């Protein structure tokens, strides 16, 4: 006792030390501290406990750590470091993830006692020892029976009688001491990937009441002292745990694999037993326990399923007809070996069955071989078509329990041949006191319902443990009256009453709820994903276990969490009538319902937040697409208008253009200018500055305001020189339209404008629109070349003809119309300041204000960077070409001179010479 209590307190001490040093000490230092303070066996024990606790979290990567627990290292120091690193890592994962696993961590003795009390209340009444019989800590270490109904560790009353059946610990020096393979039965499974039905893992022959244990238990309270890693064994522990019947066997991987080479199918399989409500009283009278443990129905999981018509699944060809194969309890056991760990089922895995009730198979029927309803194996059909009345013959009541079975009755229920006759009508349910006709569907239908209801109970993490194999049993509460009232702590009674008392009313509700909205489909999909884990097969809650919709009697929306919550509420209210004499169970079920509601609300809120974020992205994308479509339309329309304006202005006379072009441009700017001003995209430059706007957006804005600037050949000078309506990036002048031919007016406006805010933008846009309406006679005349020379400073060469053809359709080069019109009178470009000064003379001298108002010279303006394409080295190449051209000219001139001289000589000199001679 004292040694066990000290061991528990010792574990609590280590956990408290981890918690205190978690945020202050580094990972490496914490591992070193653990290695220095504790022995390997203690660290291995703590790792095992932390691993089982963390497996309660479905997001815990159990497979990674399980592989580490399998490996054996000969070097003790290396193993110690690995174990310490695993301890720190698992502890940090538990602390970060929170939830169930974090709540299970005992941080103090008081917390350990509280957890024990809660776990004691979760177990079935036949297995819980009275609080007055044992102390809390000792209850945890030595008095916990395993929840499947194999009390290898008995209460202190019965310790002396049954202590020989307790397992023996393996010493820590054993290399494979983390791999426990004994006959001790556990309730959960962290799979070692071996068939549980195989028995030759130990030397001694198995007893009928025992089952091969090849799985780690998943409940920390049920397995506080792990059988894999032991603390130093004291005399008190030896008296409790040393088994005289059979040693604790650990076999190598070669031996385990050799099993499959042998004739292991003919070996004896084990049969788990059922612990009834009268179990404790019979044990006190000394009746052998092996007689009572033969009433356990087989449980199975199809993680190791065989092909369709295997002889080992057929009772006719079964080599062991008198033994039942034990397989996994449920799909949870398979999930325990997956990456995400076991499903978050909070309660213990007790069967919570009473001996008088018709023991039935777990609500998980056969695995889905396919989605085709016709492709169902024979043993599955026999499973669905069986009758609980046969089970009554096979599994008797508590009043007429018999220690032995006849040979044919020992077959598992799912191996019963199809041709067995039904003893009772389908409308009758088996009860201990006789046959009762109930207004419910047949038990076969109920079993089909349960496969689906099982999903829903797990999807909200119901803590009552309703996934046990008796949830679809018809008789539930009648047998409970033989129990003492102080021991009625079964939290699952609400779920049992729910399934028994409201099948009639819920069946009609199922048919009415046919239509489900999108959010229900989302919830159902998420539930299926959370249930399936990483097994790769989504066991959809809309289907039954064979993947058949035709065999399903439930509506589609039955599996949604909203409907699930309503079912729980109805179940609790319906079960209150049967449990008026058990108020504490009602209280427990209400607390359980509240916790389930809280978890469901939190989950709904989380999913809603995710959906809101997705909805926001979708709205933004739709807005952006809509704006792009509008911009494309606005780009196409002004281009058509401006092409007509350019053609008219080039062919028409000046007086008609002076009167017509302002009207056309006013219509264009009035229709498109204010719209652009009010759109959100054009307002971003005031906040984010010059770097926030993309080049495309700036070009689009500029193009919409600069297209109408070409009037006619007479107004071409002032239009191209000013580049009207350019958009500057600074808030001061981004909408201020400046005309160099209206310097007196625009200079005052620029000075008085100051930093503009949102209120001034509409006013400025209207002013910009009014500027286009100014009659031409008020504009001051300018020299033709004055506007071009400023641009020619940073416009080294005109556009090539091939580039123009490509750029005419590109919205980034929408000011090409200006340069095209300018090329009519554009002279030779200026390459340096001397040429520029020589070409312009006095007219080329620009004031500081001129430089500020000219868009082509303003680095903050987009036109400064997008005016022309300048190729580096182009001027040197051009000068070389010019030099070659000059050289060719000189050569031509020299050739002409030489030819002329030769001609003169030949024509004049030669005849003269000939004449003289």
Swiss-Prot record:
Residues 914-917 are extracellular. Induction: Up-regulated by NGF. It is found in: Cell membrane. GO terms for biological process: negative regulation of angiogenesis; negative regulation of cell growth; negative regulation of cell population proliferation; negative regulation of neuron projection development; negative regulation of protein ubiquitination; negative regulation of TOR signaling. Residues 337-367, 389-410, 457-476, 568-588, 652-679, 706-727, 746-783 are annotated as: Disordered. It is a single-pass type IV membrane protein. The chain crosses the membrane at residues 893-913. PANTHER family: MAJOR INTRINSICALLY DISORDERED NOTCH2-BINDING RECEPTOR 1, MAJOR INTRINSICALLY DISORDERED NOTCH2-BINDING RECEPTOR 1 MINAR1 FAMILY MEMBER. Intrinsically disordered protein which may negatively regulate mTOR signaling pathway by stabilizing the mTOR complex component DEPTOR. Negatively regulates angiogenesis. Negatively regulates cell growth. Negatively regulates neurite outgrowth in hippocampal neurons. This is Major intrinsically disordered Notch2-binding receptor 1.
């Amino acid at each position: 006792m004292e040694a066990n209590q000290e061991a528990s307190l010792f574990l609590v001490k280590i956990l408290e030390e981890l918690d205190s040093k978690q945020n202050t000490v580094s990972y490496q230092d914490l591992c070193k501290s653990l290695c220095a303070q504790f022995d390997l066996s203690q660290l291995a024990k703590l790792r095992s406990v932390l691993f089982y606790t963390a497996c309660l979290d479905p997001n815990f990567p159990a497979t990674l750590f399980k592989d580490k627990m399998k490996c054996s290292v000969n070097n003790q120091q290396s193993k110690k470091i690995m174990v310490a690193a695993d301890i720190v890592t698992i502890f940090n994962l538990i602390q970060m993830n929170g939830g169930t696993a974090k709540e299970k961590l005992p941080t103090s003795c008081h917390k350990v006692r509280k957890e024990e009390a809660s776990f004691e209340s979760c177990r079935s009444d036949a297995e819980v020892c009275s609080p007055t019989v044992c102390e809390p800590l000792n209850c945890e270490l030595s008095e916990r029976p395993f929840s499947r109904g194999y009390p290898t560790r008995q209460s202190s009353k019965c310790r002396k009688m049954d202590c020989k059946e307790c397992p023996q610990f393996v010493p820590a020096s054993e290399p494979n001491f983390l791999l426990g393979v004994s006959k001790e039965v556990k309730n959960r499974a962290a799979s070692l990937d071996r068939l549980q039905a195989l028995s030759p893992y130990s030397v001694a022959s198995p007893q009928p009441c025992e089952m091969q244990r090849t799985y780690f238990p998943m409940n920390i309270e049920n397995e506080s002292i792990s059988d894999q890693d032991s603390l130093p064994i004291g005399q008190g522990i030896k008296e409790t745990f040393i088994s005289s019947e059979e040693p604790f066997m650990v076999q190598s991987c070669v031996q385990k694999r050799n099993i499959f080479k042998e004739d292991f199918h003919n070996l004896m399989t084990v049969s788990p037993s059922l612990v009834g409500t009268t179990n404790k009283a019979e044990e006190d009278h000394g009746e052998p326990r092996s007689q009572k443990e033969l009433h356990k129905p087989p449980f199975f999981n199809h993680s190791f399923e065989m092909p369709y018509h295997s002889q080992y699944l057929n009772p006719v060809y079964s080599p062991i007809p008198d033994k039942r194969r034990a397989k996994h309890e449920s799909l949870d056991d398979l999930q325990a070996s997956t990456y995400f760990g076991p499903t978050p089922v909070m309660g213990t895995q007790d069967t919570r069955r009473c001996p008088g009730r018709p023991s039935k198979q777990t609500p998980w029927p056969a695995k889905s071989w396919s989605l085709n309803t016709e492709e169902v194996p024979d043993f599955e059909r026999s499973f669905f078509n069986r009758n609980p009345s046969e089970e009554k013959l096979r599994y008797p009541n508590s009043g007429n329990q018999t220690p032995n079975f006849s040979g044919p009755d020992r077959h598992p229920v799912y191996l019963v041949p199809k041709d067995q006759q039904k003893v009772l009508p389908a409308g009758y349910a088996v009860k201990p006191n006789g046959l009762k006709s109930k207004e419910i569907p047949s038990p076969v239908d109920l079993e089909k319902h349960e496969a689906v209801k099982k999903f829903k109970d797990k999807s909200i993490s119901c803590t009552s443990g309703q996934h046990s194999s008796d949830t679809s049993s018809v008789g539930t509460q009648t047998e409970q009256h033989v129990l003492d009232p102080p021991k009625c702590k079964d939290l699952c009674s609400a779920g049992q009453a729910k399934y028994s008392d409201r099948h009639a009313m819920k069946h009609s509700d199922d048919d009415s709820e046919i239509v489900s909205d999108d959010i229900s489909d989302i919830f159902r999909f998420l539930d299926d994903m959370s249930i399936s884990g990483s097994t790769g097969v989504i066991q959809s809650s809309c289907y039954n276990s064979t993947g058949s919709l035709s065999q399903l009697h439930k509506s589609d929306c039955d599996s949604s969490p909203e409907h699930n919550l309503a079912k729980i509420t109805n179940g609790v209210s319906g079960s209150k009538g049967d449990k008026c004499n058990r108020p504490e169970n009602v209280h427990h079920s209400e607390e359980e319902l509240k916790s389930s509601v809280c978890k469901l609300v939190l989950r709904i809120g989380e999913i809603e937040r995710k959906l809101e974020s997705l909805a926001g992205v979708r709205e933004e994308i739709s807005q952006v697409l809509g704006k792009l479509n509008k911009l494309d339309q606005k780009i196409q329309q002004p281009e058509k208008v401006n092409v007509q304006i350019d053609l008219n202005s080039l062919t028409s006379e000046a007086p008609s253009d002076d009167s017509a072009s302002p009207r056309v441009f006013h219509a264009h700017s009035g229709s498109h200018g204010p719209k652009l001003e009010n759109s959100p995209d054009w307002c971003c430059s005031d906040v984010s500055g010059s770097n926030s706007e993309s080049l495309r957006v700036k070009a689009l804005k500029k193009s919409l305001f600069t297209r109408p600037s070409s009037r006619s050949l007479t107004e071409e000078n002032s239009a191209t020189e000013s580049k009207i309506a350019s958009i500057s990036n600074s808030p001061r002048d981004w909408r201020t339209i400046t005309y160099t031919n209206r310097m007196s007016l625009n200079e005052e406006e620029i000075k008085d404008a100051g930093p503009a805010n949102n209120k001034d933008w509409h006013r400025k846009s209207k002013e910009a629109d009014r500027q286009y309406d100014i009659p031409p006679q008020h504009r001051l005349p300018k020299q033709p070349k004055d506007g071009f020379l400023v641009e020619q400073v940073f416009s080294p060469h005109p556009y090539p003809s091939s580039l123009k053809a490509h750029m005419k359709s590109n919205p980034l080069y929408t000011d090409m119309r200006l340069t095209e019109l300018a090329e009519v009178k554009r002279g030779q470009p200026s390459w340096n300041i001397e040429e520029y000064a020589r070409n312009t003379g006095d007219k080329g001298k620009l004031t500081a204000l001129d430089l500020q108002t000219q868009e082509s010279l303003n680095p903050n303006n987009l036109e400064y960077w997008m005016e022309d394409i300048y190729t580096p080295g182009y001027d040197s190449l051009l000068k070389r070409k010019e030099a070659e051209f000059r050289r060719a000219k000189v050569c031509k001139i020299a050739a002409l001179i030489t030819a002329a001289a030769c001609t003169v000589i030949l024509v004049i000199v030669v005849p003269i010479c000939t004449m003289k001679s």
